């Protein structure tokens, strides 16, 4: 998993996972895996899945031809509400893109260490075949 800055300002974690490295062979299978991880943590609430590929196609937006499918799994760690401004950085999402021979799993860094650790562990857990 690597950390990078998207557009030179958004801290993003990215994992590129070859399909030979994971037992998940579709975006839907990765979504199922992530939903299990979310359900297994009592401090996390699943919200939904946004099919970004279908949305972009429907509005006739531009899609990189290498992307075969792309979704965001949306959830919230919301352990506390110390102030109303914290709502600006919630909920969280993990993006999953099928690039043909590999998946790209990405998420923006959260302002809360336990959330980052959990999301990183979930992404790394997809590499279950070596």
What positions do the PLM features span?
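Ser/Thr-rich, low-complexity intrinsically disordered terminal regions
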Residues: 32-84
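Short, surface-exposed coil-to-beta transition loops
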Residues: 88-92
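C-terminal partner/receptor-binding element of secreted or periplasmic proteins
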Residues: 110-130
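Terminal, regulation- and interaction-focused segments at domain boundaries
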Residues: 1-42, 51
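Generic recognition of long tandem-repeat/solenoid scaffolds
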Residues: 15, 72-74, 105
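Beta-strand/loop substructures that line and gate deep hydrophobic ligand-binding cavities in soluble
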Residues: 93-109
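Short, surface-exposed beta-strand/loop "edge" segments at domain boundaries and coil↔beta transitions
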Residues: 25, 81-85, 112-118
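Short, flexible, solvent-exposed loop/turn segments with mixed acidic/basic and small polar residues
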Residues: 3-8, 63-64, 93-97
């Amino acid at each position: 998993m690597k950390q990078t800055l998207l557009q030179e300002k958004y801290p993003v974690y990215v994992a590129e996972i070859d399909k030979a490295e994971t037992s998940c062979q579709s975006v839907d299978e990765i979504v199922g895996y992530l939903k299990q991880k979310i359900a297994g943590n009592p401090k996390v609430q699943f919200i939904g899945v946004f099919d970004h590929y279908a949305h972009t196609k429907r509005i006739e937006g531009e899609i990189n031809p290498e992307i075969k499918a792309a979704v965001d799994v949306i959830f919230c760690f919301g352990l506390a509400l110390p102030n109303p401004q914290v709502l600006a950085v919630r909920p969280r999402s993990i993006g999953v893109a099928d690039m043909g021979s590999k998946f790209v799993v990405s998420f923006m860094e959260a302002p809360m260490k336990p959330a980052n650790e959990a999301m990183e562990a979930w992404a790394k857990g997809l590499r279950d075949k070596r």
